[in-house]
């Protein structure tokens, strides 16, 4: 009988500890803090977006003027933007990339460019006609060609130590080193 009584007391003690532990866990449970999702640059074009088709109007098969572009969600501290557009030919790396647009010193207050915009920012040179302007893609041969537009949010103006007639995409990228707060890529396709 004594053995049964000891067993009963131990059993009741075990249940009471177990119950107390469970309520303590429930009372001490906290809700994790909400997750903060960082803003990311959003970059689109007039009539096209990432992984879309590049409109004919912006190529040499039509008017060939520069595309309208829009962006939002710049990180804090952005003082200016830069935009490049290029593609890699099938013979890359034997043949260098083709650059169609090098545009920098776009004020942080600007969040869009209209079609054929020529008065905002500073143009570097393209590799097609070596002019300080946009030049339209003029894809050679059949099949889809992929073009890459990149938007850069900068915390300071690029360090450019050459004349504007010598600012290539590579010169600009070098001048933006350690000044890029964020960047985003828009890849588009054009088929002749």
Range-by-range predicted roles:
Residues 13-17:
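C-terminal motif of bacterial Sec signal peptides marking the signal peptidase cleavage site
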Residues 18-192:
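N-terminus-centered regions that define maturation/targeting leaders and the start
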């Amino acid at each position: 009988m004594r053995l049964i009584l000891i067993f009963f007391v131990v059993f009741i003690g075990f249940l009471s500890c177990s119950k107390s532990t469970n309520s303590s866990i429930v009372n001490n449970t906290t809700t994790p803090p909400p997750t903060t999702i960082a803003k990311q640059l959003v970059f689109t074009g007039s009539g096209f977006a990432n992984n879309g088709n590049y409109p004919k109007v912006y190529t040499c098969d039509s008017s060939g003027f520069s595309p309208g572009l829009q962006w939002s969600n710049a990180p804090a501290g952005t003082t200016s933007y830069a935009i490049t557009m290029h593609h890699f030919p099938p013979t890359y790396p034997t043949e260098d990339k083709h650059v169609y647009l090098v545009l920098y010193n776009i004020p942080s207050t600007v969040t869009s460019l209209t079609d054929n915009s020529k008065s905002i920012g500073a143009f570097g040179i393209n590799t097609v006609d070596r002019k300080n302007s946009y030049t339209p893609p003029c894809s050679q041969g059949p099949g889809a060609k992929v073009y890459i537009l990149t938007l850069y949010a900068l915390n300071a103006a690029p360090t450019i130590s050459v004349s504007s007639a010598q600012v290539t995409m590579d010169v600009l990228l070098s001048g933006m080193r350690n000044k890029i707060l964020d960047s985003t890529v828009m890849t588009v396709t054009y088929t002749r």
